[in-house]
Amino acid sequence: MQQWVDCEFTGRDFRDEDLSRLHTERAMFSECDFSGVNLAESQHRGSAFRNCTFERTTLWHSTFAQCSMLGSVFVACRLRPLTLDDVDFTLAVLGGNDLRGLNLTGCRLRETSLVDTDLRKCVLRGADLSGARTTGARLDDADLRGATVDPVLWRTASLVGARVDVDQAVAFAAAHGLCLAGG
């Protein structure tokens, strides 16, 4: 098992490396390429993966806690199961990935591309989806209670069976042009 603590990598090409069971703490990765990398069963705490590329990367059974994925791109990755605790995906591209059933509670997904992403049965309680691009996203049976969302999500994502707060239900109605009136 490798441990990388307080280290920094810029523009590093990790393509096709086996980094399974890697442990990072306070590591900084900027513009690195993790395409084809095996990061299965890895653990990351307080690490940042900024503007990195993850294509066909295996991340299953991994844990990310207090990490930043700012501006990183994920394409055709194996992401389930995955443990996420206070992860910042601001400006990341997760479009087209299978995130079914993941717990994204409290994660920041501001201005994240979730186009055609499968988020069915995800827990997004308290998540920040402000400005997220959600065209074709599948949020069926997801738990969105307490999440911050823009009106565009209510119009562009599939939400059959999603759990929402009353305020969110009112926002959904307004986004669809419904007029709510009492009795």
UniProtKB/Swiss-Prot annotation:
Residue ranges annotated for the Pentapeptide repeat domain, each copy included: 113-147
UniProt cross-references to InterPro entries, sorted A to Z: 5peptide_repeat (IPR001646), Pentapeptide-BTB/POZ_domain (IPR051082)
Transmembrane segments: none
Domain of life per record: Bacteria
Coiled-coil portions: none
Record's comment describing the protein's domains: Each subunit forms a right-handed beta-helix with 8 complete coils that stack upon each other.
Subunit: Homodimer. Probably interacts with DNA gyrase.
NCBIfam families: mfpA_AE000516.2 (NF000349)
Family to which the UniProt record says this protein belongs: Belongs to the pentapeptide repeat protein family.
Function as written in the Swiss-Prot or TrEMBL entry: Might be involved in fluoroquinolone resistance. Also inhibits fluoroquinolone-promoted dsDNA cleavage. Increases fluoroquinolone (ciprofloxacin or moxifloxacin) inhibition of gyrase supercoiling activity in a concentration-dependent manner. Inhibits DNA relaxation and supercoiling by E.coli gyrase.
Name of the protein in its database record: Pentapeptide repeat protein MfpA
Organism: Mycobacterium tuberculosis (strain ATCC 25618 / H37Rv)
